[in-house]
C-alpha cells in the first residue's frame, strides 16, 4: 500500500523518512527540473540588483515562477494520485497540502488520547470514521484545571462508548502478556472478555516463575517525600529496593542469556522525581552497565503504547493518611500493569494503597 506522510519530517523516525511528503517530492522525476528553475530564479534575483534592464529580468523571473508553480502542482497531483493512505496527526490534517481533499475513510489511532476538538479537524474531510483506542487507558493531557472541569478531557471516543455502545467493538484476543498478568485487567476493566492468545498464554522467562510479584514495602521504612508540583513525589528507599530487585532478577536469568536474548526491562513510576532518581541509581551502579540499552525508565504516561519482557512498578505513595493522589485514576494503573509480557513486579506500601478499592 502506497503511504504518504504529511507533517514535520524532523519528527519522523528514520525508518519512515522515505514515506514523507518532502522525500517523495524530492524523489519525483520532475523535481530536478523544478530545482533548476528555482536556482535560475535565485540567480536572476542576484543579477537584478546591479542590472540596468531590471524590468526584463523581472519578467523572466515571473515566467519562471509560473513554470515552477505548474511543476509543483503536477508533482503534488502525482503524489496524491499514487498514495492510497495519507498519514498525519490530527492537527496536521489542516495542512495546506490537504486543502480541498476528500477521503472515504478516516482512521484515528489512539483515539482515547485525542482531544475531541482535534478530531473534528480531519472528520470534516471524510465520509466515514473509525476510532481505534482504549478509553480504559490514559486520556489526553489537559493541564488547565478550568478546561478540564469544562469537559475538555472528555474524548470523542468516550462520548461514543457512552451514547452509542452498539457501534463499539472490543478486540478480545491479546498477543502481549502472560494470562496471569492479563487476568486482573481483563476482569476489572473489560468484563472478563479479553483472552490471551495460545502462544502467549503461559509465556515466561524462568521455569516455574510467578508472572506477578507484589513486594510490600510497609515494614521497610519506605517513606514518600513531596518535591514540588512539577516532579511530584519521591520514595528513595523504594527506588533503591526496586533497583535491588531488578539486579536480583537479572542475576537469576543469567548475564549471558539476558544479553543474548535481549530481554528488555521497563522501570515505571507515576512520578517524575522517582523516575529521575531511578535513572541516577542505574547510572551509578556498574552492575547495570552491560544492560543499560535494554532498560528503560519512564513515567506511566511515557510508557503508554509500549511493552517490555519485564516490568517493575514503583508506586511511591506511603503515608499514614492513605493518600494515593492520581494513583486513584484507574486508567493510569491499567496502563502500568499491562506493559509486561512475561514478568510484572510491583513495589508499594500495602497499608497506604489498600485504602482505595482498586
Regions found by a protein language model. Name each.
Residues 6-10, 14, 20, 30, ...:
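Conserved helicase motor core of SF1/SF2 NTP-dependent helicases
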Residues 17-104:
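Conserved helicase NTPase catalytic core signature
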Amino acid at each position: 500500500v502506497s503511504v504518504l506522510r504529511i507533517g514535520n519530517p524532523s519528527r519522523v523516525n528514520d525508518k519512515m523518512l522515505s514515506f514523507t511528503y518532502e522525500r517523495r517530492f524530492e524523489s519525483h522525476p520532475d523535481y530536478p527540473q523544478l530545482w533548476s528553475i528555482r536556482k535560475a530564479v535565485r540567480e536572476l534575483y542576484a543579477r537584478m540588483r546591479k542590472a540596468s534592464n531590471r524590468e526584463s529580468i523581472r519578467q523572466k523571473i515571473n515566467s519562471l515562477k509560473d513554470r515552477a508553480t505548474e511543476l509543483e502542482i503536477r508533482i503534488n497531483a502525482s503524489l496524491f494520485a499514487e498514495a492510497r493512505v495519507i498519514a498525519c496527526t490530527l492537527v496536521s490534517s489542516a495542512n495546506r497540502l490537504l486543502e480541498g481533499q476528500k477521503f472515504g475513510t478516516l482512521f484515528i489511532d489512539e483515539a482515547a488520547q485525542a482531544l475531541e476538538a482535534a478530531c473534528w479537524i480531519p472528520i470534516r474531510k471524510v465520509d466515514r470514521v473509525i476510532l481505534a483506542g482504549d478509553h480504559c487507558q490514559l486520556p489526553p493531557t489537559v493541564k488547565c484545571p478550568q478546561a478540564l472541569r469544562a469537559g475538555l478531557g472528555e474524548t470523542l471516543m468516550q462520548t461514543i462508548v457512552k451514547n452509542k455502545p452498539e457501534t463499539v467493538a472490543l478486540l478480545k484476543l491479546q498477543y502481549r502478556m502472560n494470562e496471569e498478568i492479563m487476568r486482573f485487567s481483563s476482569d476489572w476493566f473489560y468484563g472478563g472478555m479479553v483472552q490471551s492468545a495460545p502462544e502467549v498464554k503461559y509465556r515466561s522467562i524462568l521455569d516455574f516463575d510467578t508472572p506477578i510479584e507484589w513486594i510490600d514495602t510497609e515494614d521497610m521504612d519506605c517513606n514518600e517525600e513531596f518535591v514540588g508540583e512539577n516532579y511530584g513525589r519521591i520514595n528513595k528507599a523504594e527506588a533503591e529496593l526496586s533497583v535491588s530487585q531488578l539486579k536480583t532478577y537479572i542475576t537469576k536469568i543469567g548475564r549471558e542469556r539476558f544479553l543474548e536474548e535481549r530481554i528488555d526491562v521497563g522501570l515505571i513510576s507515576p512520578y517524575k522525581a522517582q523516575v529521575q532518581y531511578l535513572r541516577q541509581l542505574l547510572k551509578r551502579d556498574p552492575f547495570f552497565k552491560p544492560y543499560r540499552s535494554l532498560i528503560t525508565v519512564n513515567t506511566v504516561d511515557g510508557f503508554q503504547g509500549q511493552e517490555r519482557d519485564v516490568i517493575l512498578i514503583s508506586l511511591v505513595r506511603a503515608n499514614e493518611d492513605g493518600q494515593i493522589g492520581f494513583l486513584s485514576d484507574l486508567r493510569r494503573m491499567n496502563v502500568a500493569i499491562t506493559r509486561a509480557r512475561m514478568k510484572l513486579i510491583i513495589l508499594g506500601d500495602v497499608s497506604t494503597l489498600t485504602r482505595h478499592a482498586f
